[in-house]
């Protein structure tokens, strides 16, 4: 499934939650599908979507979903340790792995080779 199709399928299920969306193209896609007050577009913050989502989840009782790309996660691996340490029940990090840094020219990430973020 392509990222756009995934975002389009998810949006109807995320009406009551806060959604933090990754830099660049994913934010543009989410905006074009459905711009809502509960959507936060992280333009110019590559690698920080998960950190921003975590911070937001620690300040509200609402569910927070962060949509992050594999390239951004790889740029800020420390956020995964912080998320695991704090472990807020109202936070979901959804990593969309397309094997590339899509917003900077589609250079391949290590997930396109031997690295798996799922394991």
Predicted feature residues:
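Active-site pocket-lining segments that scaffold enzyme catalytic pockets across diverse folds
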Residues: 1-16
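Thiamine diphosphate
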Residues: 4-6, 32-119
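Acidic-glycine-rich active-site phosphate/pyrophosphate-binding loop
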Residues: 17-36
